[in-house]
């Protein structure tokens, strides 16, 4: 891993993208690795994009001190950890696969304890660095899919964690999400990072 090369690579990427006519750009997570101060190096570069640009939260984005975890979304310019936006007959849904996780909340946070109990219940037990969507977020996604269906919009989802094919890097509750998505013909694509 050569993370010290990231600012230079990101600058080259932004320069390349700025030569294109893009509708938008989505970064699929892991914007940093283990150092909250790294956001100050890469966020200003990313913000030089001419096209509208968005973030999805990755597991490495939360590998920071407990007192910094709550600051991560705002540092990336996010008002909400999951959100949606529309463009030309499409509904784009950015979801938070770190909603239920062992690392995205402080160690003494009740959400971390609940995530530990959930993780312990999974068989076979997936890696601790993955995460899941909470019930509230799953309901929110379904509401968005229903609204997209009614508006005759196609839907593309963005998440850090994959859901398919079945493997150890997937969202802990990939099955619940794929079952939900399969009920809505408006869903055209699911795009992930992580791997």
Report residues per predicted region.
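Alpha-helix N-cap and loop-to-helix initiation/capping positions
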Residues: 2-5, 129-133, 172
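Active-site neighborhood of phospho(di)ester-bond hydrolases with catalytic His/Asp-centered motifs
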Residues: 25-30, 53-59, 95, 156-159, ...
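Extended active-site neighborhood of metal-dependent phosphoesterases/phosphodiesterases
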Residues: 37-151, 176-186
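Long, structured stretches of catalytic cores involved in phosphate-ester chemistry, encompassing
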Residues: 153, 163-195
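Second-shell loop/turn segments in exported
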Residues: 29-32, 126-131, 165-166
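Short acidic, glycine-rich surface-loop motifs adjacent to enzyme active sites
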Residues: 145-165
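N-terminal active-site segment of His-dependent metallophosphoesterases
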Residues: 1-40, 136
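Short, well-ordered secondary-structure micro-motifs
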Residues: 22, 66-67, 105, 167-170
């Amino acid at each position: 891993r050569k993370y010290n090369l990231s600012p230079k690579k990101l600058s080259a990427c932004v320069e390349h993208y700025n030569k294109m006519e893009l509708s938008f750009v989505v970064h699929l997570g892991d914007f940093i690795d283990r150092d909250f101060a790294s956001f100050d190096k890469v966020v200003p570069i990313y913000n030089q994009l001419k096209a509208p640009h968005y973030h999805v939260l990755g597991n490495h984005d939360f590998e920071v001190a407990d007192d910094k975890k709550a600051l991560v979304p705002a540092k990336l310019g996010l008002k909400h950890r999951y959100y949606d936006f529309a463009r030309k007959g499409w509904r784009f849904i950015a979801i938070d696969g770190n909603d239920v996780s062992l690392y995205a909340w402080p160690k003494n946070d009740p959400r971390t304890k609940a995530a530990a109990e959930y993780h312990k219940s999974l068989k076979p037990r997936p890696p601790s660095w993955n995460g899941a969507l909470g019930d509230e977020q799953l309901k929110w996604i379904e509401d968005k899919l229903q609204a997209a269906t009614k508006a005759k919009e196609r839907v593309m989802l963005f998440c850090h964690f994959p859901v398919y094919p079945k493997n150890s890097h997937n969202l802990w509750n990939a099955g619940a999400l794929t079952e939900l998505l399969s009920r809505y013909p408006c869903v055209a694509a699911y795009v992930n990072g992580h791997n």
